[in-house]
Every structure is written in structure tokens, then in C-alpha cells.
Amino acid sequence: MPELTFRNAEEKDVPLILEFIKKLADYEHRLDEVIATEEALKYWIFDKNQAEVIFALEDGKEIGFAFFFLSFSTYIANVNMHLEDLFIDPEYRGKGYGKALLRELAKIVKERGYGRFEWTCLEWNESSKEFYKSLGAEEKDWDVFHFTGQSLEDFINED
């Protein structure tokens, strides 16, 4: 039976992190939006310690990843783990690895004393929503807004 293990990413893993980001973006039909570079990932994850990555490994081979960072909740006056990306290679799905990776993250939340474990999900991704609900996660009534690129510039420079 295959063995599932986890490990924290190291600086040498930056190319692999970017590879998983692109695989996820391709799955989400958003590959054309990826402008991340190895240099930027190294800077923010390892030089500035603004995010963390954990790999899921089957028999020592990286088959998925979780990319997360901290946010803050004023209501509970505590930090939250925000899961930005979760991805398991398609050929390894259906083995419980996604659930196991989420459980590993939940353990980190508990061990570090964070207030919440949260993430977002694309509206069209019903299979992921059902998966999260089957684990007991609650869907919240929030819409996500953001400025990026030109919309950010336009807002800053608006008269």
C-alpha cells in the first residue's frame, strides 16, 4: 500500500511550487492569468516569510501541495490560516490525499493556536464545494473583491 507523507517546502523547491501553481491554474481554466515567477515566489515565501507550502508525497514523490499564509480576524482577535491553493495531481485523486492534506493543515492551525482555517472556492467548482462540505466545512456568505494590475492603478489614480 502506498505511503502518504508530508513535508515543508524548501527554497530548492521553488520550481516545483511554480509547477503546481500552473497545474492548478490549468485545472481552473486560468493558466493565462499566472504571472508568478520563481524569483517572486522565492522572495515572498523564503526571503520575506509571507507564505508557506507543504507538499503531499506518495512513496516519496510530490503529488500535491498546499500554499497558505496568515490573515487576521478582528472579530476573534487572532490570526487565521488562509489556504490559497490546494492541489492533488489528477492521477492521485480519489485516494483520500486531499482530505489528508487538509487534515495536516488543520493540525498546524491547532498546534500554532490560530483562530480559523479558511479558504475560497471558485463558484463553478461544485465538486470541490461538495468535497469541503462533506468534511464538515461551512460555506460562508462572503463575496471576494480585489483590485489587481490595471484596476488597482485606475483606482489609485481616479479623480
What residues fall within each predicted segment?
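Conserved acetyl-CoA pyrophosphate-binding loop and the N-cap/start of the following alpha-helix
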Residues: 92, 96-104
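A short beta-loop-alpha structural element at the N-terminal edge
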Residues: 5-17
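Conserved GNAT-fold acetyl-CoA-binding loop/helix
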Residues: 18-43
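Conserved beta-strand-loop-alpha-helix junction that forms the acyl-donor binding cleft
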Residues: 119-128, 146-150
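A short helix-loop-beta-strand connector motif used in the catalytic cores of GNAT acetyltransferases and
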Residues: 43-55, 82
